[in-house]
Protein backbone atom coordinates (compact mmCIF):
# COMPACT_ATOMS: atom_id res chain seq x y z
CA UNK A 1 0.00 0.00 0.00
CA UNK A 2 2.80 2.42 0.86
CA UNK A 3 4.19 2.30 -2.66
CA UNK A 4 0.89 3.25 -4.37
CA UNK A 5 1.04 7.03 -3.73
CA UNK A 6 4.61 7.04 -5.10
CA UNK A 7 3.53 5.17 -8.23
CA UNK A 8 0.55 7.50 -8.76
CA UNK A 9 2.72 10.60 -8.26
CA UNK A 10 5.35 9.33 -10.68
CA UNK A 11 2.69 8.47 -13.24
CA UNK A 12 1.17 11.94 -13.01
CA UNK A 13 4.55 13.63 -13.41
CA UNK A 14 5.42 11.40 -16.38
CA UNK A 15 2.07 12.19 -17.97
CA UNK A 16 2.57 15.93 -17.50
CA UNK A 17 6.05 15.73 -19.00
CA UNK A 18 4.71 13.82 -22.01
CA UNK A 19 1.85 16.29 -22.49
CA UNK A 20 4.16 19.31 -22.23
CA UNK A 21 6.69 17.74 -24.60
CA UNK A 22 3.95 16.96 -27.11
CA UNK A 23 2.59 20.52 -26.87
CA UNK A 24 6.07 21.97 -27.33
CA UNK A 25 6.82 19.64 -30.26
CA UNK A 26 3.56 20.47 -32.04
CA UNK A 27 4.16 24.16 -31.40
CA UNK A 28 7.63 23.86 -32.91
CA UNK A 29 6.18 22.12 -35.98
CA UNK A 30 3.65 24.94 -36.40
CA UNK A 31 6.36 27.60 -36.09
CA UNK A 32 8.60 25.82 -38.62
CA UNK A 33 5.71 25.44 -41.08
CA UNK A 34 4.62 29.07 -40.63
CA UNK A 35 8.12 30.42 -41.15
CA UNK A 36 8.80 28.17 -44.14
CA UNK A 37 5.67 29.58 -45.82
CA UNK A 38 6.52 33.20 -44.97
CA UNK A 39 8.94 35.38 -46.92
CA UNK A 40 12.11 36.02 -44.91
CA UNK A 41 12.13 39.75 -44.19
CA UNK A 42 14.63 42.21 -42.81
CA UNK A 43 14.09 43.84 -39.44
CA UNK A 44 15.80 45.22 -36.33
CA UNK A 45 17.63 42.71 -34.11
CA UNK A 46 15.84 41.35 -31.06
CA UNK A 47 16.73 42.83 -27.68
CA UNK A 48 15.54 39.85 -25.64
CA UNK A 49 14.23 36.31 -26.19
CA UNK A 50 11.56 36.80 -23.53
CA UNK A 51 10.33 40.24 -24.59
CA UNK A 52 11.66 40.65 -28.13
CA UNK A 53 11.32 44.32 -29.04
CA UNK A 54 8.17 44.82 -26.97
CA UNK A 55 9.94 46.65 -24.15
CA UNK A 56 11.71 48.99 -26.58
CA UNK A 57 8.41 49.92 -28.23
CA UNK A 58 6.49 50.13 -24.94
CA UNK A 59 9.04 52.41 -23.26
CA UNK A 60 9.57 54.67 -26.26
CA UNK A 61 8.22 58.22 -26.00
CA UNK A 62 7.25 58.00 -29.67
CA UNK A 63 6.71 54.43 -30.87
CA UNK A 64 5.30 55.75 -34.16
CA UNK A 65 8.67 57.31 -34.96
CA UNK A 66 10.30 53.93 -34.27
CA UNK A 67 8.03 52.19 -36.78
CA UNK A 68 8.79 54.88 -39.36
CA UNK A 69 12.54 54.63 -38.71
CA UNK A 70 12.47 50.86 -39.18
CA UNK A 71 10.43 51.21 -42.40
CA UNK A 72 13.05 53.60 -43.77
CA UNK A 73 15.87 51.23 -42.81
CA UNK A 74 14.42 47.80 -43.64
CA UNK A 75 11.70 48.50 -46.19
CA UNK A 76 7.99 49.30 -46.07
CA UNK A 77 7.27 45.72 -44.92
CA UNK A 78 9.57 44.29 -42.27
CA UNK A 79 9.79 41.81 -39.41
CA UNK A 80 9.80 42.44 -35.65
CA UNK A 81 10.73 40.05 -32.85
CA UNK A 82 8.06 39.45 -30.24
CA UNK A 83 7.92 37.71 -26.84
CA UNK A 84 9.35 34.20 -26.50
CA UNK A 85 11.00 34.20 -29.92
CA UNK A 86 7.82 34.96 -31.87
CA UNK A 87 7.85 37.10 -35.02
CA UNK A 88 5.39 39.48 -36.62
CA UNK A 89 5.24 41.18 -39.99
CA UNK A 90 4.70 44.96 -39.99
CA UNK A 91 2.98 46.57 -43.00
CA UNK A 92 3.75 50.21 -43.85
CA UNK A 93 2.99 49.76 -47.57
CA UNK A 94 -0.43 51.21 -48.63
CA UNK A 95 -1.12 48.43 -51.15
CA UNK A 96 -0.30 45.73 -48.60
CA UNK A 97 -2.49 47.45 -46.01
CA UNK A 98 -5.40 47.59 -48.45
CA UNK A 99 -5.01 43.86 -49.08
CA UNK A 100 -5.18 43.00 -45.38
CA UNK A 101 -8.19 45.19 -44.63
CA UNK A 102 -10.07 43.93 -47.69
CA UNK A 103 -9.81 40.36 -46.34
CA UNK A 104 -10.40 41.24 -42.67
CA UNK A 105 -12.59 38.84 -40.62
CA UNK A 106 -12.06 36.03 -43.18
CA UNK A 107 -8.47 35.88 -44.48
CA UNK A 108 -7.07 37.83 -41.53
CA UNK A 109 -8.56 37.41 -38.05
CA UNK A 110 -7.97 38.71 -34.55
CA UNK A 111 -5.22 37.29 -32.37
CA UNK A 112 -6.71 34.59 -30.18
CA UNK A 113 -5.85 36.32 -26.90
CA UNK A 114 -7.41 39.61 -28.05
CA UNK A 115 -10.58 37.84 -29.12
CA UNK A 116 -10.71 36.01 -25.78
CA UNK A 117 -10.28 39.35 -24.00
CA UNK A 118 -13.15 40.88 -26.00
CA UNK A 119 -15.39 37.93 -25.22
CA UNK A 120 -14.58 37.95 -21.51
CA UNK A 121 -15.13 41.66 -20.92
CA UNK A 122 -17.49 42.79 -23.72
CA UNK A 123 -19.30 39.66 -24.86
CA UNK A 124 -19.78 38.09 -28.28
CA UNK A 125 -20.58 41.33 -30.07
CA UNK A 126 -19.32 42.89 -33.26
CA UNK A 127 -15.73 43.46 -32.06
CA UNK A 128 -15.49 39.77 -31.10
CA UNK A 129 -17.16 38.32 -34.20
CA UNK A 130 -15.39 37.03 -37.31
CA UNK A 131 -16.56 35.93 -40.76
CA UNK A 132 -20.29 35.43 -41.32
CA UNK A 133 -21.12 36.24 -37.69
CA UNK A 134 -19.43 39.63 -38.05
CA UNK A 135 -21.17 40.29 -41.37
CA UNK A 136 -24.60 39.48 -39.88
CA UNK A 137 -24.10 41.64 -36.80
CA UNK A 138 -22.77 44.56 -38.84
CA UNK A 139 -25.77 44.47 -41.18
CA UNK A 140 -28.10 44.48 -38.19
CA UNK A 141 -26.43 47.58 -36.74
CA UNK A 142 -25.93 49.56 -39.96
CA UNK A 143 -29.36 51.31 -40.03
CA UNK A 144 -28.61 53.00 -36.70
CA UNK A 145 -25.59 54.75 -38.23
CA UNK A 146 -27.05 55.87 -41.56
CA UNK A 147 -26.88 59.54 -42.57
CA UNK A 148 -30.59 59.91 -41.82
CA UNK A 149 -30.13 58.49 -38.32
CA UNK A 150 -27.14 60.74 -37.57
CA UNK A 151 -28.97 63.80 -38.88
CA UNK A 152 -31.83 63.03 -36.48
CA UNK A 153 -29.59 62.72 -33.41
CA UNK A 154 -27.28 65.68 -34.12
CA UNK A 155 -29.41 67.98 -31.89
CA UNK A 156 -28.44 65.73 -28.96
CA UNK A 157 -24.78 66.67 -29.48
CA UNK A 158 -25.58 70.38 -29.50
CA UNK A 159 -27.72 69.93 -26.38
CA UNK A 160 -24.81 68.32 -24.49
CA UNK A 161 -22.52 71.17 -25.56
CA UNK A 162 -24.99 73.81 -24.35
CA UNK A 163 -25.44 72.04 -21.01
CA UNK A 164 -21.67 72.30 -20.62
CA UNK A 165 -21.81 75.98 -21.60
CA UNK A 166 -24.46 76.59 -18.95
CA UNK A 167 -22.31 74.90 -16.31
CA UNK A 168 -19.22 76.88 -17.32
CA UNK A 169 -21.14 80.17 -17.40
CA UNK A 170 -22.26 79.49 -13.84
CA UNK A 171 -18.60 79.15 -12.85
CA UNK A 172 -17.79 82.46 -14.58
CA UNK A 173 -20.69 84.25 -12.89
CA UNK A 174 -19.53 83.08 -9.48
CA UNK A 175 -16.07 84.54 -10.23
CA UNK A 176 -16.92 87.87 -11.92
CA UNK A 177 -13.62 89.60 -11.13
CA UNK A 178 -11.43 87.00 -12.79
CA UNK A 179 -10.13 87.49 -16.33
CA UNK A 180 -10.35 83.77 -17.02
CA UNK A 181 -11.06 80.47 -15.29
CA UNK A 182 -8.86 77.37 -15.13
CA UNK A 183 -10.99 74.44 -16.28
CA UNK A 184 -9.81 70.83 -16.43
CA UNK A 185 -11.33 70.20 -19.86
CA UNK A 186 -10.79 66.46 -20.26
CA UNK A 187 -13.25 65.66 -17.48
CA UNK A 188 -15.89 67.83 -19.15
CA UNK A 189 -15.29 66.20 -22.54
CA UNK A 190 -15.80 62.83 -20.83
CA UNK A 191 -19.14 64.02 -19.49
CA UNK A 192 -20.25 65.33 -22.88
CA UNK A 193 -19.38 62.04 -24.56
CA UNK A 194 -21.09 59.86 -21.94
CA UNK A 195 -24.31 61.88 -21.88
CA UNK A 196 -24.41 62.07 -25.69
CA UNK A 197 -24.05 58.33 -26.26
CA UNK A 198 -26.54 57.69 -23.47
CA UNK A 199 -29.26 59.89 -24.97
CA UNK A 200 -28.56 59.41 -28.69
CA UNK A 201 -27.90 55.71 -28.45
CA UNK A 202 -30.07 54.43 -25.62
CA UNK A 203 -32.56 57.19 -24.70
CA UNK A 204 -30.94 57.42 -21.27
CA UNK A 205 -29.50 60.59 -19.74
CA UNK A 206 -26.60 59.80 -17.42
CA UNK A 207 -26.70 63.45 -16.28
CA UNK A 208 -22.94 63.60 -15.75
CA UNK A 209 -22.70 67.16 -17.12
CA UNK A 210 -24.98 68.33 -14.30
CA UNK A 211 -22.95 66.35 -11.77
CA UNK A 212 -25.30 63.38 -11.35
CA UNK A 213 -23.47 60.38 -9.83
CA UNK A 214 -22.92 57.52 -12.28
CA UNK A 215 -21.49 54.08 -11.56
CA UNK A 216 -20.27 53.70 -15.14
CA UNK A 217 -18.52 57.09 -15.06
CA UNK A 218 -16.80 56.15 -11.81
CA UNK A 219 -15.43 52.98 -13.41
CA UNK A 220 -14.31 54.82 -16.56
CA UNK A 221 -12.55 57.40 -14.40
CA UNK A 222 -10.79 54.71 -12.38
CA UNK A 223 -8.80 53.71 -15.48
CA UNK A 224 -7.28 57.19 -15.53
CA UNK A 225 -6.18 56.95 -11.91
CA UNK A 226 -4.73 53.42 -11.92
CA UNK A 227 -1.81 52.88 -14.28
CA UNK A 228 -0.78 49.36 -15.37
CA UNK A 229 1.65 47.92 -12.81
CA UNK A 230 4.74 45.88 -13.69
CA UNK A 231 2.84 42.60 -13.34
CA UNK A 232 0.04 43.79 -15.66
CA UNK A 233 2.56 44.82 -18.29
CA UNK A 234 4.44 41.50 -18.04
CA UNK A 235 1.23 39.48 -18.27
CA UNK A 236 0.01 41.47 -21.26
CA UNK A 237 3.35 40.97 -23.02
CA UNK A 238 3.34 37.20 -22.55
CA UNK A 239 -0.41 36.57 -22.95
CA UNK A 240 -0.24 35.88 -26.70
CA UNK A 241 2.24 33.05 -26.04
CA UNK A 242 0.69 31.88 -22.75
CA UNK A 243 -3.10 32.56 -22.89
CA UNK A 244 -3.50 31.48 -19.27
CA UNK A 245 -2.10 34.91 -18.37
CA UNK A 246 -5.54 36.32 -19.19
CA UNK A 247 -6.97 34.39 -16.24
CA UNK A 248 -4.46 35.61 -13.67
CA UNK A 249 -5.43 38.57 -11.46
CA UNK A 250 -3.83 42.00 -11.84
CA UNK A 251 -4.93 45.59 -11.33
CA UNK A 252 -6.06 46.16 -14.94
CA UNK A 253 -8.03 42.93 -15.17
CA UNK A 254 -9.84 43.87 -11.97
CA UNK A 255 -10.84 47.22 -13.49
CA UNK A 256 -12.04 45.61 -16.72
CA UNK A 257 -14.05 43.07 -14.73
CA UNK A 258 -15.69 45.88 -12.77
CA UNK A 259 -16.34 47.83 -15.98
CA UNK A 260 -17.89 44.75 -17.60
CA UNK A 261 -20.22 44.14 -14.66
CA UNK A 262 -21.25 47.80 -14.40
CA UNK A 263 -21.99 48.18 -18.12
CA UNK A 264 -23.79 44.82 -18.12
CA UNK A 265 -26.14 45.99 -15.37
CA UNK A 266 -26.81 49.29 -17.15
CA UNK A 267 -27.34 47.56 -20.51
CA UNK A 268 -29.81 45.11 -19.01
CA UNK A 269 -31.72 47.97 -17.42
CA UNK A 270 -31.79 50.11 -20.58
CA UNK A 271 -32.80 47.21 -22.81
CA UNK A 272 -35.61 46.12 -20.51
CA UNK A 273 -37.01 49.64 -20.10
CA UNK A 274 -36.99 50.16 -23.87
CA UNK A 275 -38.75 46.85 -24.47
CA UNK A 276 -41.49 47.78 -22.00
CA UNK A 277 -41.87 51.23 -23.56
CA UNK A 278 -42.20 49.79 -27.05
CA UNK A 279 -44.57 47.02 -25.98
CA UNK A 280 -46.80 49.67 -24.40
CA UNK A 281 -47.22 51.55 -27.67
CA UNK A 282 -50.29 51.08 -29.79
CA UNK A 283 -49.75 48.40 -32.40
CA UNK A 284 -47.05 46.66 -30.39
CA UNK A 285 -44.14 48.28 -32.25
CA UNK A 286 -40.66 46.83 -32.01
CA UNK A 287 -38.62 50.00 -31.74
CA UNK A 288 -37.40 52.70 -34.05
CA UNK A 289 -34.99 51.07 -36.49
CA UNK A 290 -33.10 54.36 -36.86
CA UNK A 291 -31.94 54.46 -33.24
CA UNK A 292 -29.19 52.25 -31.89
CA UNK A 293 -31.30 50.52 -29.29
CA UNK A 294 -34.25 50.34 -31.71
CA UNK A 295 -32.09 48.59 -34.30
CA UNK A 296 -30.92 46.13 -31.67
CA UNK A 297 -34.47 45.32 -30.60
CA UNK A 298 -35.58 44.92 -34.21
CA UNK A 299 -32.65 42.62 -34.96
CA UNK A 300 -33.51 40.54 -31.89
CA UNK A 301 -36.92 39.77 -33.39
CA UNK A 302 -37.36 36.18 -34.54
CA UNK A 303 -38.91 37.48 -37.77
CA UNK A 304 -35.79 39.35 -38.83
CA UNK A 305 -33.39 37.66 -41.27
CA UNK A 306 -30.63 39.54 -39.45
CA UNK A 307 -31.61 38.07 -36.10
CA UNK A 308 -29.11 38.52 -33.30
CA UNK A 309 -29.39 36.88 -29.89
CA UNK A 310 -30.04 38.67 -26.60
CA UNK A 311 -26.43 37.92 -25.64
CA UNK A 312 -25.29 39.70 -28.81
CA UNK A 313 -27.65 42.63 -28.16
CA UNK A 314 -26.12 43.19 -24.72
CA UNK A 315 -22.62 42.82 -26.17
CA UNK A 316 -23.30 45.51 -28.81
CA UNK A 317 -24.54 47.89 -26.11
CA UNK A 318 -21.41 47.26 -24.04
CA UNK A 319 -19.12 48.07 -26.97
CA UNK A 320 -21.09 51.08 -28.21
CA UNK A 321 -21.21 52.64 -24.76
CA UNK A 322 -17.47 52.18 -24.28
CA UNK A 323 -16.53 53.36 -27.79
CA UNK A 324 -18.92 56.31 -27.68
CA UNK A 325 -17.42 57.46 -24.40
CA UNK A 326 -13.70 56.92 -24.90
CA UNK A 327 -12.81 57.92 -28.43
CA UNK A 328 -14.79 61.15 -28.87
CA UNK A 329 -13.80 62.56 -25.48
CA UNK A 330 -10.12 61.97 -26.29
CA UNK A 331 -10.46 63.64 -29.71
CA UNK A 332 -12.26 66.67 -28.27
CA UNK A 333 -9.58 67.06 -25.60
CA UNK A 334 -6.82 66.91 -28.21
CA UNK A 335 -8.65 69.52 -30.29
CA UNK A 336 -8.68 71.97 -27.37
CA UNK A 337 -4.99 71.23 -26.73
CA UNK A 338 -3.95 71.91 -30.32
CA UNK A 339 -6.12 75.02 -30.59
CA UNK A 340 -4.53 76.29 -27.36
CA UNK A 341 -1.10 75.73 -28.91
CA UNK A 342 -2.14 77.49 -32.13
CA UNK A 343 -4.22 80.61 -31.32
CA UNK A 344 -4.14 81.67 -34.99
CA UNK A 345 -5.89 78.44 -36.00
CA UNK A 346 -8.34 78.86 -33.13
CA UNK A 347 -9.25 82.37 -34.28
CA UNK A 348 -9.56 81.32 -37.92
CA UNK A 349 -11.99 78.59 -36.88
CA UNK A 350 -13.94 81.04 -34.72
CA UNK A 351 -14.19 83.42 -37.66
CA UNK A 352 -15.66 80.69 -39.87
CA UNK A 353 -18.24 79.86 -37.19
CA UNK A 354 -19.15 83.50 -36.48
CA UNK A 355 -22.11 83.46 -38.89
CA UNK A 356 -23.88 81.09 -36.50
CA UNK A 357 -24.39 83.66 -33.74
CA UNK A 358 -28.14 83.10 -33.48
CA UNK A 359 -28.46 79.48 -34.56
CA UNK A 360 -26.48 76.27 -34.88
CA UNK A 361 -25.22 74.67 -38.08
CA UNK A 362 -27.44 72.00 -39.57
CA UNK A 363 -26.11 68.48 -40.05
CA UNK A 364 -25.65 69.26 -43.75
CA UNK A 365 -23.63 72.38 -42.89
CA UNK A 366 -21.52 70.45 -40.39
CA UNK A 367 -20.85 67.84 -43.05
CA UNK A 368 -20.18 69.98 -46.13
CA UNK A 369 -20.53 73.69 -45.34
CA UNK A 370 -17.70 74.42 -42.90
CA UNK A 371 -14.41 73.53 -44.61
CA UNK A 372 -12.11 74.85 -41.89
CA UNK A 373 -14.00 73.07 -39.10
CA UNK A 374 -13.76 69.94 -41.23
CA UNK A 375 -10.01 70.52 -41.67
CA UNK A 376 -9.40 71.00 -37.93
CA UNK A 377 -11.41 67.91 -37.00
CA UNK A 378 -9.68 65.64 -39.51
CA UNK A 379 -6.25 66.97 -38.62
CA UNK A 380 -6.93 65.95 -35.01
CA UNK A 381 -8.13 62.52 -36.17
CA UNK A 382 -4.96 62.18 -38.25
CA UNK A 383 -2.45 63.35 -35.67
CA UNK A 384 -4.03 61.90 -32.53
CA UNK A 385 -5.74 58.62 -33.39
CA UNK A 386 -6.93 56.94 -30.16
CA UNK A 387 -5.55 53.52 -31.21
CA UNK A 388 -2.05 53.09 -32.56
CA UNK A 389 -2.06 49.65 -34.15
CA UNK A 390 -4.11 46.94 -35.88
CA UNK A 391 -2.91 43.36 -35.39
CA UNK A 392 -4.25 40.26 -37.15
CA UNK A 393 -3.35 36.59 -37.69
CA UNK A 394 -3.26 35.01 -41.14
CA UNK A 395 -6.16 32.52 -41.36
CA UNK A 396 -4.79 30.69 -44.43
CA UNK A 397 -1.56 30.91 -46.40
CA UNK A 398 -1.70 34.11 -48.43
CA UNK A 399 0.29 36.38 -50.76
CA UNK A 400 0.33 40.12 -49.97
CA UNK A 401 1.05 42.48 -52.91
CA UNK A 402 3.35 45.48 -52.41
CA UNK A 403 3.13 48.96 -53.87
CA UNK A 404 6.90 49.42 -53.51
CA UNK A 405 9.27 46.48 -54.15
CA UNK A 406 11.64 45.60 -51.31
CA UNK A 407 14.71 43.51 -50.65
CA UNK A 408 14.18 40.40 -48.54
CA UNK A 409 16.60 39.08 -45.92
CA UNK A 410 18.04 36.76 -48.58
CA UNK A 411 18.74 39.69 -50.92
CA UNK A 412 15.93 39.08 -53.44
CA UNK A 413 13.86 41.99 -54.77
CA UNK A 414 10.13 41.18 -54.55
CA UNK A 415 6.86 42.96 -55.27
CA UNK A 416 4.82 40.61 -53.05
CA UNK A 417 5.41 38.53 -49.94
CA UNK A 418 4.09 35.17 -48.78
CA UNK A 419 2.64 34.82 -45.27
CA UNK A 420 1.95 31.42 -43.75
CA UNK A 421 -1.15 30.48 -41.78
CA UNK A 422 -0.77 31.65 -38.18
CA UNK A 423 1.61 34.51 -39.01
CA UNK A 424 0.98 37.66 -36.97
CA UNK A 425 0.67 40.79 -39.13
CA UNK A 426 0.29 44.33 -37.82
CA UNK A 427 -0.38 47.80 -39.23
CA UNK A 428 0.95 50.78 -37.22
CA UNK A 429 -2.12 52.90 -37.96
CA UNK A 430 -1.07 56.05 -36.12
CA UNK A 431 2.38 55.88 -37.70
CA UNK A 432 0.77 55.69 -41.16
CA UNK A 433 -1.32 58.77 -40.31
CA UNK A 434 1.93 60.65 -39.56
CA UNK A 435 4.24 59.11 -42.15
CA UNK A 436 6.46 61.73 -43.79
CA UNK A 437 6.44 59.86 -47.10
CA UNK A 438 2.64 60.14 -47.26
CA UNK A 439 1.89 63.45 -45.53
CA UNK A 440 4.94 65.58 -46.31
CA UNK A 441 7.76 67.08 -44.29
CA UNK A 442 5.32 68.63 -41.77
CA UNK A 443 3.56 65.30 -41.14
CA UNK A 444 4.20 65.48 -37.37
CA UNK A 445 2.79 69.03 -37.10
CA UNK A 446 -0.76 70.28 -36.59
CA UNK A 447 -1.55 71.88 -39.96
CA UNK A 448 -5.30 71.93 -40.76
CA UNK A 449 -4.64 73.70 -44.06
CA UNK A 450 -3.35 70.42 -45.49
CA UNK A 451 -7.00 69.33 -45.74
CA UNK A 452 -8.07 72.20 -47.96
CA UNK A 453 -8.50 71.18 -51.59
CA UNK A 454 -5.35 72.43 -53.31
CA UNK A 455 -3.03 71.16 -50.58
CA UNK A 456 -4.78 67.78 -50.19
CA UNK A 457 -4.54 66.95 -53.89
CA UNK A 458 -0.74 67.10 -53.70
CA UNK A 459 -0.34 64.53 -50.92
CA UNK A 460 0.69 60.90 -51.43
CA UNK A 461 -1.67 59.99 -48.59
CA UNK A 462 -4.31 59.54 -51.29
CA UNK A 463 -2.76 56.08 -51.70
CA UNK A 464 -4.37 55.11 -48.38
CA UNK A 465 -7.89 53.81 -49.04
CA UNK A 466 -9.40 54.42 -45.58
CA UNK A 467 -11.94 57.08 -44.61
CA UNK A 468 -10.53 60.42 -45.81
CA UNK A 469 -7.25 58.56 -46.46
CA UNK A 470 -6.82 57.98 -42.73
CA UNK A 471 -6.46 54.73 -40.79
CA UNK A 472 -7.97 56.21 -37.62
CA UNK A 473 -11.19 54.24 -38.24
CA UNK A 474 -9.21 51.44 -40.00
CA UNK A 475 -10.80 50.10 -43.23
CA UNK A 476 -12.55 47.15 -44.81
CA UNK A 477 -15.25 45.04 -43.09
CA UNK A 478 -14.08 46.23 -39.66
CA UNK A 479 -14.05 49.94 -40.47
CA UNK A 480 -15.61 51.78 -37.54
CA UNK A 481 -19.39 51.63 -37.91
CA UNK A 482 -19.84 54.73 -35.75
CA UNK A 483 -17.42 57.06 -37.55
CA UNK A 484 -20.23 59.27 -38.88
CA UNK A 485 -21.68 59.49 -35.35
CA UNK A 486 -18.26 60.36 -33.89
CA UNK A 487 -17.42 63.03 -36.48
CA UNK A 488 -20.85 64.69 -36.20
CA UNK A 489 -20.55 64.84 -32.40
CA UNK A 490 -16.97 66.12 -32.62
CA UNK A 491 -17.95 68.93 -35.00
CA UNK A 492 -21.14 69.92 -33.18
CA UNK A 493 -19.52 70.16 -29.74
CA UNK A 494 -16.39 71.91 -30.98
CA UNK A 495 -18.47 74.47 -32.92
CA UNK A 496 -20.29 75.48 -29.74
CA UNK A 497 -17.21 75.67 -27.52
CA UNK A 498 -15.13 77.71 -29.98
CA UNK A 499 -17.96 80.16 -30.66
CA UNK A 500 -18.35 80.97 -26.97
CA UNK A 501 -14.90 80.54 -25.38
CA UNK A 502 -11.19 81.02 -25.99
CA UNK A 503 -8.68 78.44 -24.78
CA UNK A 504 -5.00 78.65 -23.85
CA UNK A 505 -2.47 76.96 -21.59
CA UNK A 506 -2.00 78.77 -18.26
CA UNK A 507 1.79 78.41 -18.63
CA UNK A 508 1.97 79.19 -22.35
CA UNK A 509 1.73 77.26 -25.64
CA UNK A 510 4.95 75.32 -25.01
CA UNK A 511 3.33 73.38 -22.15
CA UNK A 512 4.32 69.72 -22.54
CA UNK A 513 1.54 67.19 -23.06
CA UNK A 514 2.34 63.48 -22.71
CA UNK A 515 0.47 60.22 -23.20
CA UNK A 516 -1.29 58.59 -20.27
CA UNK A 517 -2.68 55.06 -20.48
CA UNK A 518 -6.36 54.71 -19.64
CA UNK A 519 -8.61 52.34 -21.60
CA UNK A 520 -7.05 54.06 -24.60
CA UNK A 521 -4.12 56.47 -24.46
CA UNK A 522 -5.21 59.90 -23.23
CA UNK A 523 -3.39 63.25 -23.17
CA UNK A 524 -2.09 64.62 -19.87
CA UNK A 525 -0.32 67.88 -19.07
CA UNK A 526 3.04 66.85 -17.68
CA UNK A 527 3.14 67.13 -13.90
CA UNK A 528 -0.59 66.61 -13.42
CA UNK A 529 -1.98 63.70 -11.42
CA UNK A 530 -3.92 61.45 -13.74
CA UNK A 531 -5.20 62.33 -17.21
CA UNK A 532 -5.79 66.03 -16.54
CA UNK A 533 -5.63 68.91 -19.01
CA UNK A 534 -6.21 72.26 -17.25
CA UNK A 535 -6.74 75.17 -19.66
CA UNK A 536 -7.32 78.88 -19.14
CA UNK A 537 -10.79 79.56 -20.51
CA UNK A 538 -12.29 82.98 -21.28
CA UNK A 539 -15.69 83.92 -22.62
CA UNK A 540 -15.87 85.39 -26.11
CA UNK A 541 -17.23 88.91 -25.81
Swiss-Prot record:
Stretches that traverse the bilayer: 12-32
Domain of life: Eukaryota
Enzyme's top EC category: oxidoreductase
A GO CC annotation given for this chain: membrane
Topology in the lipid bilayer: Single-pass membrane protein
Coiled-coil ranges from the UniProt annotation: none
InterPro entries assigned: Cyt_P450 (IPR001128), Cyt_P450_E_grp-I (IPR002401), Cyt_P450_sf (IPR036396), Cytochrome_P450_monoxygenase (IPR050121)
Cofactor: heme
GO MF terms held by the record: heme binding; iron ion binding; monooxygenase activity; oxidoreductase activity, acting on paired donors, with incorporation or reduction of molecular oxygen
Described function: Cytochrome P450 monooxygenase; part of the gene cluster that mediates the biosynthesis of clavilactone A, a meroterpenoid that features a unique benzo-fused ten-membered carbocyclic ring unit with an alpha,beta-epoxy-gamma-lactone moiety, forming an intriguing 10/5/3 tricyclic nested skeleton. Cytochrome P450 monooxygenases claO, claP, claQ, claU, and claW are close orthologs, suggesting that a redundant function or pseudogenes are present in the cla cluster. These monoxygenases are not involved in clavilactone A biosynthesis nor its modification.
Pfam families in the record: p450 (PF00067)
Keyword Cytoplasm attached: no
Disulfide bond positions: none
Binding-site list for heme: 480
Pathway assignment: Secondary metabolite biosynthesis; terpenoid biosynthesis
Family membership: Belongs to the cytochrome P450 family.
Protein location: Membrane
Alphabetized UniProt keyword annotations: Heme, Iron, Membrane, Metal-binding, Monooxygenase, Oxidoreductase, Transmembrane, Transmembrane helix
Gene: claU
Name of this chain's protein: Cytochrome P450 monooxygenase claU
Keyword Transmembrane: yes
EC number: 1.-.-.-
Amino acid sequence: MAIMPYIRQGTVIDTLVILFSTWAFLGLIRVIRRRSNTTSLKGPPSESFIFGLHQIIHKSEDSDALYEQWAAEYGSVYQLSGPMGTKRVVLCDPKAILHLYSKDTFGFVQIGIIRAFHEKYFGRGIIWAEGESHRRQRKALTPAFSNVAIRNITPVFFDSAYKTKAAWDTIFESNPTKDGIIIEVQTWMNHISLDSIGIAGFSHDFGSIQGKPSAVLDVFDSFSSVQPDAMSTLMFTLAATFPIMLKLPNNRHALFAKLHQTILEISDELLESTRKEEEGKAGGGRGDAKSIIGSLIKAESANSHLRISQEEVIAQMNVLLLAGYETTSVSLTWALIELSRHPDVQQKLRDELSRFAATDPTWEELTNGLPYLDAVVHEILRLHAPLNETTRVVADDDVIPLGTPLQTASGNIVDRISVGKGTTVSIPTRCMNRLTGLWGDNAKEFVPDRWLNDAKDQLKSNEIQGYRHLLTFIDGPRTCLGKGFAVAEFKAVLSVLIRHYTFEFPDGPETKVVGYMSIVERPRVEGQDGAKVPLLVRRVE
